[in-house]
Amino acid sequence: LSAGSINSPQLLQLSGVGPSGLLQSLGIDVVVDLPGVGENLQDHVMAGMSFSVKNDKDVPPQKVTGNKKTDSYVNSAVSYVAFHNIFNDADAFRGKIQARVKAIPDELNVDDSVREGYRAVYDKIANDLFYSNVSPVEILGNVMFGSISLQAALQHPLSRGNIRITSKNPFDYPRINPNYFREDIDLKILREAFKLIREITQQPPLKDHIASENWPGNGVQSNEQWEDWIRNAAGTEYHPSSTCAMLPRNKGGVVN
């Protein structure tokens, strides 16, 4: 059964496959008690900075600067930035991640099987991913008439949400809890990514074409100001996943 990361757990739960406590509370007969159905929701949370350009006339986006290489970047390029390029103290921050991921599973109100799956995945993230050249963030460029938008999207969040039905009616929307920024580490990674974006715009060739930073603006400088802005500006990149995890059932997955 595959209906996407939102509707797959919804249909399974409606069919009696999912966390028994949830199903029984809604009067649904339990066919298979599978606690991981609807858990482990992950998403690429993102936000974008906006800059006005010096040539703000009615110029098509593909010719905003007149330089093909520059225009190519700000219109269509996607950059994946390695962990050590985002954090000056990358080793120290990796240590914080390792310490944190050991504690997260025990803090979550989930079934023991789901907790074991979290432990396995978090261990992989902390010990492999953040020590490789795999990027924790994606940086995207986009040009509109008179402005440039540079966005950062978190690629490997530590925060986990869930999806749960609210009734037996298949036409009722499930409750989606993305749980963005439950883990402060996610917020800090995005914060440093946006600092990098600001730095990029202050270097050639972009600095020669940017007139001002419109959003969030130069008033945002401290770590606290960056984090407040991100909390208010961030949203989904529409990449939810993992609500029917391809893990063994004893680790909260749906694979027998």
Language model: regions and residue ranges:
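C-terminal structured subdomain/cap of oxidoreductase catalytic cores
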Residues: 1-51, 56, 148-205, 228-256
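Mid-to-C-terminal "cap/lid" subdomains and adjacent gly/pro-rich loops that border
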Residues: 9-12, 16-144, 205, 221-225, ...
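Short, internal active-site loops enriched in acidic
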Residues: 145, 219-221, 250-252
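Short coil/turn linker and secondary-structure boundary residues
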Residues: 185, 217-224
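Short, glycine/acidic-rich hinge or "gate" loops at secondary-structure transitions
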Residues: 207-219
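Residues in intrinsically disordered, low-complexity segments of regulatory proteins
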Residues: 214, 225-228
